[in-house]
Amino acid sequence: MPSLKSAAKEARVVMNGLAFGESPRWHDGRLWFCNWGTGQIIAVDADGNSQVMLTVPATLPYSIDWLPDGRLLVVCGREGLVLRQEADGTLVTHADLRHLSGNPWNEIVVDGRGNIYVNGGGPAPAPGQHFGPGAIVLIAPDGSVRQVADKIAFANGMAVTPDNKTLIVAE
């Protein structure tokens, strides 16, 4: 395995031509991400071989993550929906967040127990103003949805510690 120092010398572009790549995730030996301009979820390997894994119809896929059973989740922020890809490739609504906020939902992270955290910001600020207030919701494995944090300025990255006890939010 190369050291970080030697790996940095080997940095290279593995894919060009994206409209707007977002929500990078490593899954099953490939880098997956959303391409906002096309509505596609793309996976690319270290050699640059890419594959469109899913095209989300009529929505902008903001971010992705996987349930512990391997099913893909997609946050469609403008629509206020979390979609789930079934084994046959179909998309179904996993959670509807529209009743919680009229503002777009953004980032997603799933912990090892199947709890799903989704954050959303407030309305886009006017020039010179700040983002917020936003919120974080928890979608439990039983499907229930509840807000777990509010007054978040602009959460754009989350992680859960390996023991599933702490949600870390980049604000």
Predicted regions mapped to residue ranges:
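Sequence-structural signature of mature extracellular/luminal beta-sheet repeat domains
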Residues: 1-171
